[in-house]
Amino acid sequence: TDAGVSGYGCSWAIEFAESMGKAIIGEDPLNHERLWQKIYVPKFIGRRGTSCKTVSAIDIALWDIKAKVAGMPLYRLLGGFRERIPCYVAGGYYAENKGITQLQKEMEEYVSWGIRAVKMKVGALSLKEDARRVQAVRQVLGDDVKLMLDANCAYRFFEAIEFSRMVEEYRPYWLEEPVDADDYD
């Protein structure tokens, strides 16, 4: 900033970051939402993949600047007040030769560590196969462990609805990124 405050955000896409950064040089870094809209909405190089990761890096740098200017840690600037925060383990990823039994063993191991919430990957197999995976995981987790699902934008709108109905009885705590945020169809 012109006041000498630097914000840091990581991105391996230096060229994208430099291009987007030029669009906001000279702007008030505390006007965060306006700057975010300025680099995200015009679709500099698209709104997926590398471009989106670069917007995220700039966004993180802007939050870093805000916290430094305010003279406080970012969690406090965002209203944080807790002494403890809940956590979960992300797992259940697809791997060659990893079937239902291996998936169940993985989830059982997390529970043996004292974990009370797990997130698993869905979206790379058919809806029916992924629903079977969710059912199998719920069987080993029992009712007291939260189960979250992450599709990483794998579904079209109607597939997401269908999959949600298929797994509803297994009580997922949430279904993360079922569809692409920019898919308006």
Model segments located where?
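Conserved, mostly hydrophobic/aromatic
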Residues: 4, 20, 58, 71, ...
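Residue-level marker of alpha-helix boundaries and capping positions
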Residues: 53-54, 97-98, 154, 177-178
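Catalytic core of soluble alpha/beta enzymes
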Residues: 120, 125-185
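Acidic (Asp/Glu)-rich catalytic clusters
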Residues: 76-81, 104-114, 134-143, 165-169
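Glycine-rich, aromatic-flanked loop segments that form ligand/cofactor-binding clefts
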Residues: 59-95
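Active-site mouth loops of central-metabolism enzymes
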Residues: 48, 84-104, 122-123, 151-157
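General structural feature for long, well-ordered alpha-helical segments within catalytic domains
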Residues: 16, 31, 35, 54, ...
